Structures are given as C-alpha cells and as structure tokens.
Regions:
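Acidic, low-complexity Ser/Thr/Gly/Pro-rich repeat segments typical of extracellular/periplasmic
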Residues: 2-260, 287
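Short, surface-exposed secondary-structure junctions/capping segments
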Residues: 39, 43, 55, 297-310, ...
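Pocket-edge structural micro-motifs
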Residues: 74, 124, 221, 305, ...
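Conserved beta-strand and immediately adjacent loop positions that scaffold enzyme active sites
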Residues: 98, 135, 272, 334-335, ...
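Gly/Pro-biased beta-strand-loop elements
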Residues: 161, 245-353
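Exported/periplasmic cell-wall-interacting domains
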Residues: 175, 298, 315-417
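Structured segments of extracytoplasmic/periplasmic soluble domains
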Residues: 182, 186, 190, 276, ...
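Short, glycine/acidic-rich beta->alpha junctions
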Residues: 217, 258, 265-268, 366-371
Length: 417
C-alpha cells in the first residue's frame, strides 16, 4: 500500500470581472491577502456615430464576439496572502492560453486548467514571505489576445517548519528501520502536516505514520520491510500551515533502499544469539548479557549506529571512577548500538569464559571478536535484534522502539486515523 494524501480545494473569487466597452476606463481593486483583479480586454460592437445614416439594410443584431475579461485571485498588489491558498486565474469570455506563476527566485508553481480552459488553479504550496508574479495570456471570443500580469506577496511566517530525516538519502538500511522525521519547530496542526507526507514503495507495503510528539513523526510498515524494497519519502510541506503562524518553507524527497533481511534473536537465558539471513539460519553465536543489577532489556531493538572501534565509559550510565563496577575501555571493537541508553552488541574478549554459559556484562550483548566481526559485516543500520529472557522491558523512545508497539496502537498514533 502506498500512503499519501488527496487534497481538495474550494475556489473563492473575491474580485469583480467587468467587461468594458471600448473607450471606458478601468481600475484595479486591491485587498491584502485576497480579492481579485479584473483585467478587461478590448471589446467590439457596432458604432452609433452621430451623423451616420441609418438604412433598413443595417443590421440591428449585436455581435456575439467579446474580448477576454480576466480575474486573478489574489488581487494585484495584495500582501499577506496565505501560502496554503491556491492562486486562480479566470476568464469570462474565450479561454486562457498560457499561465505561469513564479516566485522572486524564479521557481515555478505548478497548476492546471479546467476542461474548457476558462480557469487555471495553482497548487496551494507557496513560500511564506515571497513575492509572486502571475503572467500569461487569454484569447477572447473576438480572437484578440489579452496579456495577463499580476503580482502579490505572501505573509511572513514568524516560525518556519523544516525537516531532518532518518534514513539518509541514498542509504541502504535494514528491514526494521522506521522512517523518522524531526521538525525544527513544534507542529500544532498535525493533520495538515501529515496530509503532505507520502511514502511510495516498489512493492505493496501496508504502513502508517505515528506521531511520537509535536516535533517527531515516524513511519513503519505493519511487518518488516520486504528485502530489496525501494522507498521514496515525499515531504511536501512548503506552504503548509502547521499552526501558531508556523509555515512550511521548503519540502524535500528522500529515497532509500532496503537491504537483505538480517533478523537476530538473543535469548538471555540460554546465552545464545541466532542470526537468520533472508529467512535461513546463518549462525548461532554464544553470548553473554547483563548481570544482576544491569539486566539487558527484552524487546525488539533496532541497530542505530555501527562503530568498528568505540570507547565505552561507564560514566555515561552513571558510574563514577572508584566504583567497583566502573570501566573505561578505549577500544571496544565491532560495536553496534541498539538503545539510546547505552546497550550495544560488541566484541568482548575479556568475557570469553562466560560466553554461552553466564551473564556477566553491564547490559550489553558480548561475544568473541571473531563472531562480533562476522555479525558486524552482515548487518545494516535498521536491522532488528529481538531480545527475550528478562523481565526488564524496552522503554518507549529508548532507541528506535517502534516495533514494541502493537500495530493497532501504532496506527492510532496517526493524526489522520
């Protein structure tokens, strides 16, 4: 399944379209944030010139041709136009022949004509605090071309909305990686923002967005990503009103790939880790896990970071020098982070005598250097490690914990559920 959004927009034309006869004057109507501009073209009609003779053969039937009369919304010269409102250009006679909408940087805004080309409507995705120019032409039923030109400015946002994303563009990741979008400012109108987010996949995938808080929204599938899937995330938030005068100032697209399926299961009670690659058992590894007082958490963990060498200092988990449990090892090899609080899977040659038989670590899963290197070379950021055998469970947000939430509860975290 491809998640996305369909947007419907109403049309409000506040301007007055006036078809003027030749020789009359015209004036523009200006209104901040709205209104419409009416641009009459030249019109043709039969002359009643004084002194001209009238004969029975002279036709009294009025001409059916007319010059194009144009209305642009927002009005020419308008300021503080809301970026999430569409721009419309309408003619009451003839048809529009070409319309272009550009900002002051030269970036075009896409739009479309209706069936008979009497109206053009832009996508409602303008930049806040920008100047825009509408240009083009229309052709009246009289065959005459009428030029179109109008300018306006959008309102200035007091706060912008920009996104940073996990994973990286072009990255190949594991089958359990949740898409994570971090906003630079809080989102009040989550539904409006979520409508602008979409995920496209090369194979059908059932997935959902889930708001972690007002500054983070994640996406994961119902089940692990199928191996080899190509994924494109479109963050189409330019011009979106996130609430509290916070407006999307840009959008971005992220494309990434899912690698092979590497699913690992750690059984703390049996002191083993099994690794299955594309569904087949690849290796069973003797391990040691957390001892009493440092129990390894059970739950679905996801590899977040990988280090060929990593310093591990117990001060990061609250232990101080002088404590009998304190350690500071400068060169732990083949370390892979699975929690924010400091649990890793890594090589632990100092505990080789306990691997496969006892739990002696401070919470990490340790193994031989040979097995740790092999495991490191198989995995990607985003691969799942499922830990069982303890009564201590994963806390929400202590790492990439999306898979510890039921699918029903996860979907309920969508602002559009």
């Amino acid at each position: 399944m491809v998640s996305g959004s369909v947007r419907k927009h109403g049309l409000a034309v506040a301007g007055i379209c006036v078809l003027l006869l030749a020789g009359t004057a015209c004036s523009d109507t200006k209104a901040d944030g709205g209104g419409g501009q009416s641009t009459p073209g030249a019109s043709t009609s039969q002359s009643n010139t004084p002194g001209a003779s009238s004969t029975p053969d002279a036709s009294s039937t009025p001409s059916e041709s007319a010059a194009a009369s144009i209305a642009v919304v927002p009005a020419k010269g308008a300021t503080s136009v809301q970026p999430d409102k569409p721009v419309t250009v309408t003619t009451t006679a003839g048809k529009l022949t070409a319309i272009t909408l550009k900002d002051d940087d030269g970036d075009k805004v896409t739009g479309s004509f209706n069936t008979d080309k009497t109206q053009w409507t832009s996508q409602p995705q303008l930049k806040p605090g920008a100047s825009y120019t509408v240009s083009g032409s229309a052709e009246g039923t009289d065959g005459a071309t009428v030029p179109i030109s109008s300018t306006f400015k959008t309102l200035k946002a007091s706060k912008s909305l920009k996104a940073s994303v996990v994973p990286l563009n072009g990255e190949t990741v594991g089958v359990a990686l949740p898409i994570q979008i971090f906003w630079n400012n809080p989102v009040k109108d989550r539904a409006a923002v979520e409508k602008r987010l979409s995920v496209k996949t090369s194979v059908p995938v059932d997935g959902s967005w889930h708001w972690v808080n007002s500054k983070q929204v994640n996406y994961r599938p119902k089940n692990y990503w199928p191996a080899g899937t190509k994924v494109t995330v479109n963050i189409d938030t330019q011009g979106v009103n996130a609430g509290n005068n916070t407006w999307g100032t840009s959008g971005r697209t992220i494309a990434f790939s899912i690698g092979k399926s590497v699913v690992s299961n750690v059984n703390v009670k049996t002191h083993t880790m099994t690794v299955r690659i594309n569904g087949k058992l690849a290796r069973t590894i003797p391990i040691t896990a957390g001892k009493d007082g440092f129990t390894t958490r059970s739950g679905v963990k996801v590899i977040m970071e990988k280090f060929t060498v990593k310093r591990m200092d117990a001060a990061t988990v609250g232990l101080k020098p002088g404590d009998p449990e304190y350690y500071n090892i400068p060169d732990v090899k083949w370390a892979q982070r699975v929690t924010s609080s400091g649990e890793f899977i890594h090589g632990a040659p100092w505990s080789s005598g306990s691997q496969g038989s006892a739990n002696v670590s401070h919470g990490c899963v340790g193994m031989s250097l040979k097995d740790a290197q092999w495991f490191f070379n198989q995995t990607l950021r985003g691969d799942p490690v499922i830990v069982t055998g303890t009564t201590r469970h994963m806390e929400p947000g202590n790492g990439w914990t999306d898979w510890n939430t039921t699918w029903a509860a996860y979907k309920a975290g969508s602002a559009l559920s």
